Amino acid sequence: MKKRILDMCCGSRMFYFDKHDPNVLFTDIREYHDTLCDGRKLDVQPDMLADCTALPFEVETFNMVVFDPPHLQKVGQNSWLCKKYGKLPENWQAFINDSIHEGMRVLKTGGTLIFKWNEQQIKVGEVLKAITDYKPIFGHRTTIKNQTIWMAFMKW
């Protein structure tokens, strides 16, 4: 079966109802296994290792792309937050912009890119300023503090 959905930064697949959905190709730049300080297992086990800024796929391959990158810039390399969510590079603006462009490149015309962001350290307005050529159609805030934003981009 050909995968129709690409998750560019799957991490431990936290928000999926089916963590092994046959329609989704789960990619991440890392594979990682650990037990967190509270005893929970952390498994970052992508189907394929891939850099979201340089995806190894042809143009217009997927119907949907999911992009949930690391959101933290100020986090200790060995902290549980870094282990679980990853860490943004220092040049995070270029990383986000390049990743969105790559996601849109592999997205089919008429497809949707879902971008999830958490504002704990960097506000969504700053993130959107870093993205050239694309803007979300709509977004929705979730969580108790309204710090997580889900945004939908469309490829026309």
Sequence positions of predicted segments:
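Class I S-adenosyl-L-methionine-dependent methyltransferase catalytic core
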Residues: 1-156
